Amino acid sequence: MEIIHETILEVDVNRLKSNFIYLKSKLKEKTKIIAVMKAYAYGHGDIILAKKLEEFGVHALWVADFEEGSRLREGGVQIPIIIANPGTKSTKKIIDNKLDVVIYNFKLLQLYGELNKEICVHIKFNTGMNRYGFNADEAKIIAKTLLKYPKLKLQSICSHLAA
């Protein structure tokens, strides 16, 4: 009979806090930390970990889609939650849960702008991964478009850096 061993990973919240404090100590005082919590924290208790990170002083959380963001918000997380792939069909849920969105093309920029609702946005540029993101030469057009939609609140410029 073959013995099957389970793989178990436990997150030590005290060490998580210690690591956060250490990393924060290496940054300039006003630097904000955004914790990536994609895939429901890979099964490690997304709501529990998100609340702990919020307690430690993380500025915002980054998740893959609106379902993850909505779950965290409904679980009581108050800090900004950034949706990496907001899509086009989840706008109501995103607005209702006050979720931030990453805008990586003109279709999304126009869609969220035309909703005429206050939405915090993060503009993503392609810096070599060639997956999602505006090209650098589109920056002026993006800026002009954002001015056209004053209810879109620019929070950051971001990218997924290529190794």
Where are these regions (language model features)?
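Glycine-rich phosphate/diphosphate-binding loops that line cofactor/substrate pockets in enzymes
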Residues: F20-T31
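Active-site-proximal beta-alpha core segment in soluble small-molecule metabolic enzymes
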Residues: I3, I8-E10, R15, T31-A163
